[in-house]
Regions:
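Membrane-embedded alpha-helical segments of integral membrane proteins
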Residues: 16-79
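TPR alpha-solenoid repeat register
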Residues: 326, 360, 396, 432-433
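C-terminal/domain-edge helix-coil "capping" segments
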Residues: 70, 95-130, 199-201, 224-225, ...
């Protein structure tokens, strides 16, 4: 290097600007790729924030290495590099460690503003990308020795599902009754009643439908005490995350205790405008009404007996007229049975107690009320909003795709195709889609 060589020429000769530019471009590429990966595999969205901080803080070390080794020819590592690069890396790790609480603050949910079917703007609290948890509870084993309590094999998981789904958008729960894929697989394996499923098969099915965790359990009696024992299992590894055995004076309280245990795993608390009220306050105050509601679902899901199902729902509502979930489902069965006026009346009554419904049930009821009146455009819009609020809900996507397909407009058909495509991303093995 001559004495007249400028600093800029020296940096160019050592290729510092070129290497710095490539590093910045690589940083941008990694962040873009990271955003795609977190969205595709439902990973925490703040992972790219950590990557950005790490690559930004490591820039001084990159510039130093570029200055010493960028020029043509062979170079040796200097003492400065051997000291500075590890220190820079340590500072990066420390900075990420101290900034983690700042990055994680209120990261689980965000507010989404959407124009509803009437044109008004509505705010919805939704799970941030990568923070949503999906749970499937398989039906539990009756160890009471009393066959009259067999309905609780279905009833307890159903109560658990509705209880969890009211608490926070961060977690949604379901049972085999909500998954055609699981029902199809269970029948193929010979479990026509959807009970007695081996743990290994349950894990396989939960993994196949890309749930995060599954719940298996049993229930028994200890004198007058109602006892439930459940295991919460990681669907990916098959490892047990948490176990719970507890007793209560009634079956609803026993299911409430399981909800508390499940929510505690991820420290999930009720979000604004939602609560973890006792099941008896939001589902039904009568266990007898719940029994008829469950038996109605069993009649329809297992035997395809719609008249029996409707009769059971009617019985449940005779006992508890405020049972919103039962009345909403009754309206659907009446509609499918061709009794449009009865379906419309049931949906209207259910809407008076809509505060007792889970988020998904509320969307379904609202959309159905429009559909019963022949207003498919607004019904489609409600389901589209639901698919935006719960983007991992296969039920929302399938409902959206089907009604858009029924409307048949070019725009609706595009929405239907997009919904089916998204459904296949979430459930690649859901072959039934190809027959829709």
């Amino acid at each position: 290097m001559t004495e007249t060589e400028s600093l800029l020429e020296n940096l160019k000769r050592r290729r510092v600007p070129q290497i710095a530019g490539m590093y910045i471009a690589a940083t941008w590429l990694v962040i873009e790729l990271g955003d795609w990966v977190t969205e595709r595999f439902s990973l925490p969205g703040d992972l790219t924030s950590y990557v950005f901080i790490a690559m930004l803080v490591m820039l001084p070390a990159v510039l130093l290495v570029a200055y010493n080794h960028g020029a043509p020819g062979r170079d040796r590592w200097t003492r400065t590099e051997k000291v500075f690069v590890p220190i820079n890396a340590a500072v990066t790790v420390a900075l990420i460690w101290f900034m983690t609480p700042l990055i994680d603050v209120e990261a689980a949910t965000e507010t989404l503003t959407i124009q509803d079917e009437t044109g008004a703007l509505q705010e919805f609290e939704v799970a941030r990308r990568g923070y949503h948890r999906e749970l499937v509870s398989f039906f539990w084993e009756n160890e009471t020795g009393d066959a009259e309590l067999d309905w609780l094999s279905y009833g307890l998981p159903i109560m658990l599902m509705h209880d969890i789904n009211r608490v926070s958008p961060v977690i949604t729960a379901g049972t085999p009754f909500e998954s055609e894929l699981v029902q199809e697989r269970l029948r193929e394996q010979g479990y026509d009643q959807f009970t007695g499923v081996p743990r290994g098969l349950a894990v396989e099915l939960a993994r196949e439908r890309r749930s995060d965790v599954l719940v298996v359990g049993n229930f028994s009696l200890d004198g007058r005490q109602k006892v439930v024992s459940v295991s919460v299992i990681d669907a990916t590894s098959g490892d047990v995350i948490e176990t719970h055995t507890g007793s209560a004076g009634d079956w609803m309280a026993a299911a409430d205790a399981v909800t508390t245990k499940v929510l505690g795993i991820w420290e999930i608390t009720p979000t604004e405008n939602q609560s973890d009220d006792p099941i008896s306050e939001h589902f039904s105050s009568s266990l007898e009404a719940v029994e008829h509601y469950v038996l109605g679902q069993v009649a329809i899901k297992l035997r395809g007996n719609y008249p029996e199902g409707i009769s059971e729902f009617d019985e449940a509502l005779t006992i508890d007229p405020a049972f919103a979930e039962a009345r909403s489902l009754l309206s659907v069965m009446q509609f499918l049975n061709g009794d449009i006026d009865a379906a419309r009346a049931s949906a209207t009554l259910a809407m008076r107690n809509s505060y007792r419904l889970s988020t998904s049930s509320e969307f379904i009821l609202k959309a159905n009320r429009y559909i019963y009146d022949g207003d498919y455009e607004r019904g489609e819009r409600v389901l589209e909003i639901w698919s935006n609020v719960q983007p991992r809900s296969t039920q929302a996507l399938q409902s959206m795709a089907q009604i858009a397909q029924i409307r048949g407009t070019p725009e609706s058909l595009d929405k239907s195709i997009a919904a089916y495509d998204r459904l296949l991303e979430l459930r690649p093995n859901y072959h039934t889609i190809y027959r829709l």
